[in-house]
């Protein structure tokens, strides 16, 4: 009888260990990635995905729209349509795209983007002295965030005033050195070597939120907030996904490693796009 009990216990322990191993394997392989073939526009610097499709900037500072991706984020698309020269960084919003012009660090936005016209109209000047833009996914661009030339994060208030095509009332959201900012379904996050989350923005990033919460004191170079998912690139190039994100714990609990030698990432819906250090693009199903 004692031997039988020990056998049953050992058998259950083996089953539990096997299930845990399968679960760990499933978590580590819960995504698929496709490395896009190099084309005449390679190498690339930035890529962004959103309701207005996939947009990328190559190392010649040319801005392109990925054909066939407007309103269909799960579609990898095919080929590129040229839009603009002299672009440093791009971020996709809802039927709008924001980008940084390298000449003077000016911020521009492209409006009028639609299924019939996925590259939109003529870019409009939006703001000067900008290093980075994080577009809102709302129709109302007042809730976007930007990093100005002194590396401070600025966002809009609800009382933002419009004058012609310019928006005139930005407010400080973080006054210390900041590298990247993102606003998505999992809230507003920033990298300033360390990684921080703005409390009160989970599920509704278009609010001013509360205090910044330190998530990870490690060194990060990029972050992207999506619907229930946060992806980040460490300074060593490791692409990681934040685990344990819930409504009650929006900053999550840990990390899952995905890819190496990455430099930028952006996520929307069930997919992500990334750029590696060689300038190659990756399409990732989450």
From Swiss-Prot:
Its main location: secreted. One of its GO terms (cellular component) is other organism cell membrane. One of its GO terms (molecular function) is nutrient reservoir activity. The egg defensive protein perivitellin-2 is a pore-forming two-subunit glycoprotein that affects both the nervous and digestive systems of mammals. In addition, it is a source of both structural and energetic molecules during embryonic development. The tachylectin subunit (31 kDa) binds target membranes while the MACPF subunit (67 kDa) disrupts lipid bilayers forming large pores (inner diameter of about 5.6 nm) altering the plasma membrance conductance. Perivitellin-2 is a dimer of heterodimers held together head-to-tail by non-covalent forces. The heterodimer is composed of the tachylectin subunit (31 kDa) and the MACPF subunit (67 kDa) that are disulfide-linked. Belongs to the tectonin family. This is Perivitellin-2 31 kDa subunit. It comes from Pomacea maculata (Giant applesnail). The lineage of its organism: Eukaryota, Metazoa, Spiralia, Lophotrochozoa, Mollusca.
